[in-house]
Design a protein with these regions (language model features):
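Conserved catalytic-loop aspartate of Hanks-type protein kinases
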Residues: 181
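Short beta-strand micro-motifs within the conserved protein kinase catalytic domain, predominantly
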Residues: 56-69
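Catalytic-loop of the protein kinase fold
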Residues: 115-132
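Regulatory extensions flanking the kinase catalytic core
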Residues: 248-288
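Conserved short submotifs of the Hanks-type protein kinase catalytic core
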Residues: 68-82
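Activation segment signature within eukaryotic-like protein kinase domains
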Residues: 103-104
Length: 341
């Protein structure tokens, strides 16, 4: 039978009688070893479950797994997959700037809900953005509260982050708070509009000293042809989100009131390069995701003082790889046919 136990949230003891095989078809479980950090994750996620763009926690069970006390978080099943995967699978169907705007409005709704509760998510990235189903009218939701923290008078100082989406103040001694989530929104917006991140590691590592320096300097650009047709309004929004000084970065309220977000139907339905870029670099993106997962547990703040490269001499490994492939493809198509002798 299932019995309630004493806890601030709805935690249940699972002692038998539950048909797990049937349950797994309808829910998405997550197992955590029972400790204060795990209970904090459950608490924040449970409190945020009222938002339509945050994955709902249905129940939490306490049990013994391999001799250790555990918490089983039962969440709604997100059958639509990850944000990037859905865009990759579009094939020849164009992904438009208007769609990118609508996606960012939904993500912003989740962040606004959290920030109104004084909760910083601190790990907003595409892998944590899931669709409820594969249907056309599916809903995008934010998940994974493993690094979430309540913001108080003391700003957040714990250096836990994912490299491609980490705010510059996390890489140095400065304190950081909700503005970290806003920085992540800027990076996700950037990727949605072109298919590659604004910051990168030239060494192939998940994060390198050079990548850290570029993040701290706000060193990025809008290269053609991927950005040639993207609206200036979208670029302006990204500039406000990627401000290196967190005090100058826009808040979530300002983000939601920005015309590119709150008037998404007026955003031009311009076809973007995003789906093609993500599809062409699909294998590389899988590698990047693996690097980011391992980096979460291993990265530490590094105060490398090596001279910063100028933007003109900085090499974007991801972009250069794509340019090389494009040149090779162009050379092949331009080569004359062979005549039989």
């Amino acid at each position: 039978m299932v019995q309630p136990i004493s806890w601030p949230q709805k935690v249940l003891v699972c002692s038998g009688g539950v048909d797990v095989s049937q349950l797994l078809h309808r829910i998405m479980p997550k197992l955590l070893y029972d400790n204060p950090k795990a209970r904090q994750e459950v608490e924040y996620h449970w409190r945020a479950s009222g938002c339509p763009h945050i994955v709902h926690v249905l129940d939490v069970y306490e049990n013994i797994h391999h001799g250790k006390r555990c918490l089983l978080i039962v969440m709604e099943c997100m059958e639509g997959g990850e944000l990037f995967s859905r865009i990759q699978e579009r094939g020849d169907q164009a992904f438009t700037e208007r769609e990118a705007s609508e996606i960012m409005r939904d993500i912003g709704t989740a962040i606004q809900y959290l920030h109104s509760m004084n909760i910083a998510h601190r790990d907003v990235k595409p892998e944590n953005l899931l669709y409820t189903s594969k249907d056309k009218d599916t809903v995008l939701k934010l998940t994974d509260f493993g690094f979430a923290k309540e913001t108080t008078v003391n700003a957040l100082q714990t250096p836990c982050y994912t490299p491609y989406y980490v705010a510059p103040e996390v890489l140095g001694p400065e304190k950081y708070d909700k503005s970290c989530d806003m920085w992540s929104l800027g990076v996700i917006t950037y990727i949605l509009l072109c298919g590659f991140p604004p910051f990168y590691s030239n060494t192939g590592q998940a994060i390198s000293p050079g990548m850290k320096r570029r993040i701290r300097m706000g060193q990025y650009g809008f290269p053609n042809p991927e950005w040639a047709d993207v609206s200036e309004e979208a670029k302006q929004l990204i500039r406000h989100l990627l401000k290196t000084d967190p005090t100058e970065r826009m808040t979530v309220s300002q983000f939601m009131n920005h015309p590119w977000i709150n008037r998404s139907m007026s955003v031009p339905p311009t076809p973007l390069h995003t789906a093609r870029v993500l599809q062409e670099d699909k294998d590389h993106w899988d590698e990047v995701k693996e690097e980011m997962t391992s980096a979460l547990a291993t990265m530490r703040v590094d105060y490398d003082q090596v001279k910063i490269k100028d933007l003109k001499t900085s090499n974007n490994r991801l972009l250069n790889k794509r340019r090389k492939k494009q040149k090779q493809a162009g050379a092949s198509s331009a080569a004359p046919g062979c005549n039989n002798q």
